[in-house]
């Protein structure tokens, strides 16, 4: 099979038969994972860019402030930020998987994340219902960690929950701190 056929088959498997697909993915080479992730990342970034561009125009009465250069910037930012955040999340997730008994290696954690994130990356860009695909990807992530690290569903779920909740709590506390300090900044004196 070609790379395209492999990727389409993997996507179909993740959507229709995820447990079997994860089990068959244990020996996937790193090149396959990288190619697969690159494809879903580029599709996700392109579709997010289109949605952001269209929504920006609707908020501005049809006048989009982004222009052609802005569209390119949004796309590049989406690709780079998704790439960096995904890599950091895989490392962070692997720490918790390891603590909870997963000993099959970082590559298996990367596979669980990449393949599990398929619904979010391919369909999460859809306004208003994207959250459904985020939840679906979370559940697939649990299955992926369970199957690829051969640990219990409970341990896999706890690893994912911890890996998600701690950064969210940190973000919340930082946001609250910044908001509370913005209220203490004196306003500039108004002089007509």
Predicted regions and their residues:
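Selected alpha-helical membrane-embedding segments in polytopic membrane proteins
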Residues: 2-100
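Weak global preference for isoleucine
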Residues: 7, 11-14, 33-34, 40, ...
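A sequence-composition feature that detects small, non-aromatic residues
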Residues: 9, 38, 56, 78, ...
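Perimembrane helix-loop junctions in membrane proteins
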Residues: 24-27, 52-60, 98-105, 144-151, ...
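Membrane-helix interface segments in multi-pass membrane proteins
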Residues: 47-82, 124-134, 167-192
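Hydrophobic alpha-helical transmembrane segments and adjacent short intramembrane/lumenal linkers
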Residues: 90-170
